[in-house]
Swiss-Prot record:
The gene is matK. Belongs to the intron maturase 2 family. MatK subfamily. This is Maturase K. PANTHER family: MATURASE K. Transmembrane segments: none annotated. GO terms for biological process: mRNA processing; RNA splicing; tRNA processing. HAMAP family: MatK. It is found in: Plastid, Chloroplast. Usually encoded in the trnK tRNA gene intron. Probably assists in splicing its own and other chloroplast group II introns. It holds the Pfam family MatK_N. One of its GO terms (molecular function) is RNA binding. GO terms for cellular component: chloroplast. Keywords: Chloroplast, mRNA processing, Plastid, RNA-binding, tRNA processing.
Length: 512
């Protein structure tokens, strides 16, 4: 335990005071404009559902000053004065809006030391700032290179803490002033009470669902704590030196990649060394789902599952069911990760070998990493978004019928381009044509609904080339990337995997 405490003190930053700049009107943007924070997550605008504004540090600063002048922090705690804003409804919306903005400002402040820690760690490891670690597609080349050489995989659903106090306790080592922890508890209890009003007010529910920056930060801190201690316990059971690992801060998520973690696994009582041949462990995670793959046998994966379950139980004080960690062989198992269906294909080949006058055939097997577009979950997402029925029959989008023709076509075209861009790494892109077909007819039906016509009459009047760019956008991009001298033709380009290193978050229509 003393060794663990020393490890925690060595790696973590000093405790911070957060409530002082929040209450005393210190300009938060001056902290964010520090040279070490340029280009960090604080400059990316976040859309505000139900408002024309976009969340920014300047907006947070102005609202904090306004609340300070009106002593609004007192009214946030005191719910009895509900007529201050002219009625219960106006008070509820104003109360919720100010509470959300203060929570966002609080989350911006507590993110600053994490960003400083990220910059300092990258400078120590001499990691260039222009790296492609911000792209979530950078995980797939790693899987493509490593997964085909491994035997077993375990896809893990990281459990959510059952109580908000667990999240507060995790931050106690970072936050020194007690009032900040009390303010954090206040936000969490307000969020918990807000969920009780979901049935009575769906607008507030949608608003709270899209504005969870503080709660994402808390959850990411919890996951980062899991991986932080995972590295420590791995080092305790390590007989071979492992390479360095790190956690990188995205706009709204942490994700970590630990490559080439070489271990020799001991049993639970540290008595006998298991004779496991080359037990190479690979770990990747995005949001709440992680993948643990190994070249070792099934017993090694069961040991890791036993460790995870006990770790969550004794360190975070909640029980996690073992069925949340599925252990399967990579040769006969497919699993979902970040909107893709991943698997390892076995391609048998017969190689003819000629030795002098004798010739014989040698059977060999080549493993290949395969990425598939899950069409059925995508159709389900389109159905929830009211683009089609549950069976995939295209329907009109009535909420967009009041827009101009250009805006309607642009929105549908943007969805198609984003999906094509996100699934550029699939080896079977022709399966995406059905999704484009649904969106194309949904666009035609929406335009027909606006002009009080039928989709058939609209398509006959505009011709077969209507919305053809939905289907040719990807080919135009590929023709620009690959010259005509490339060995493969554009007709077969749907088999080529192209990982895009400019995607920073998962697509809204993709089921994670």
């Amino acid at each position: 335990m003393e060794e663990l405490q020393g490890y925690l003190k060595k790696d973590r930053s000093p405790q911070q005071h957060f409530l002082y700049p929040l209450l005393l009107q210190e300009y938060i943007y001056t902290l964010a404009h520090d040279d070490s924070l340029n280009g960090s997550i604080f400059y990316e605008p976040i859309e505000f559902i139900g408002y024309d504004n976009k969340f920014s540090l300047v907006l947070v600063k102005r609202l904090i000053i306004r609340m300070y002048q009106q002593n609004f922090l007192i009214y946030l705690v005191n719910d009895s004065n509900q007529n201050r804003f002219g009625g219960h409804t106006n008070y509820f919306y104003s109360h919720f809006f100010y509470s959300q903005m203060v929570s966002k400002g609080f989350s911006v402040i507590v993110e600053i030391p994490f960003s400083r820690r990220l910059v300092s760690s990258s400078e120590e490891k001499e990691i260039p700032k222009s790296q492609n670690l911000g792209s979530i597609h950078s995980i797939f080349p790693f899987l493509e290179d490593k997964l085909s050489h491994l035997n077993n995989v375990s896809d893990i659903l990281i459990p959510h803490p059952i109580h908000f106090e667990i999240l507060v306790q995790i931050l106690q080592c970072w936050i020194q002033d007690v009032p900040s922890l009390h303010l954090l508890r206040f936000f969490l209890h307000k969020y918990q009470n807000l969920n009780k009003t979901i049935q009575s007010n769906k607008t507030i529910y949608v608003f709270s669902k899209e504005n969870k920056r503080l709660f994402w930060f808390l959850y990411n801190s919890y996951v980062s704590e899991c991986e932080f201690l995972l590295v420590f316990f791995h080092k305790q059971s390590c007989y071979l030196r492992s390479t360095s690992s790190g956690a990188f801060l995205e706009r709204s998520h942490f994700y970590g990649k630990m490559e080439h973690i070489i271990i020799v696994c001991c049993n639970n009582f540290h008595k006998t060394l298991w004779p496991i041949k080359d037990p190479l462990i690979h770990y990747v995670r995005y949001q709440g789902k992680a993948i643990l793959a190994s070249r070792g046998n099934h017993l090694l994966m069961k040991e890791w599952r036993y460790y995870f379950v006990n770790f969550w139980q004794y360190y975070f004080h909640f029980w996690s069911q073992p069925y949340r960690m599925h252990i399967n062989s990579l040769l006969n198992y497919s699993f979902y990760f970040m909107g893709y269906l991943l698997r390892v294909l076995i391609n048998p080949y017969a190689v003819k070998n000629q030795m002098l006058e004798n010739s014989f055939l040698i059977d060999t097997v080549i493993k290949k990493f395969d990425t598939i577009i899950p069409i059925i979950p995508l159709i389900g997402s389109l159905s929830k978004a009211k683009f089609c029925t549950f069976s995939g029959h295209p329907i009109s989008k009535p909420i967009w019928a009041d827009l101009s023709d250009f805006d309607i076509i642009d929105r549908f075209g943007r969805i198609c381009r984003n999906l094509s861009h996100y699934y550029s790494g699939s080896s079977k892109k022709q399966s995406l044509y059905r999704i484009k077909y649904i969106l194309r007819l949904s666009c035609a039906r929406t335009l027909a609904r606006k002009h009080k016509s039928t989709a058939r009459a609209l398509l006959q009047r505009l011709g077969l080339g209507f919305l053809e760019e939905f289907f040719t956008e990807e080919e135009q991009v590929l023709s620009f990337i690959f010259p005509k001298t490339t060995l493969f033709t554009l007709h077969g380009s749907h088999r080529e995997r192209i990982w895009s290193l400019d995607i920073i978050r998962i697509n809204d229509l993709v089921n994670n």
